[in-house]
Amino acid sequence: MGFMFLAESFDEWAKPKVKNGYNRFFATDAEKDVVNLVHATRNHPSIVMWSSGNEVPDQWGAEGVKRAKWLQEIFHREDPTRPVTVGMDQVKATMESGFGAIMDIPGLNYRLPLYDEAFKKFP
């Protein structure tokens, strides 16, 4: 039996979900944490892709797009062989901001009625 794994890094970036969350460390530690994750797991045969976040509040607006690009570039620099995704629960917002379009593989969580529209916007 084989398993395929998506190695996920963060539950929040710069915008907080909770008062004492990772957002307090994002600016100083995110790059180091991505590098450590990739270096620790990149040679495992079950890792098929990377995720730079799950339902992060940064999905809204231009700053979130910049952060998504920055994180994806770090993953690509450290491992150019695997794609990067983000689990996006704000599908409409990611279509409008361009957030989803920059992902190697857009990760759509929920919002099933928007999938056809998202498929057209996220080639």
Roles of regions detected by a PLM:
Residues M1-D116, P123:
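Active-site mouth of glycoside hydrolases
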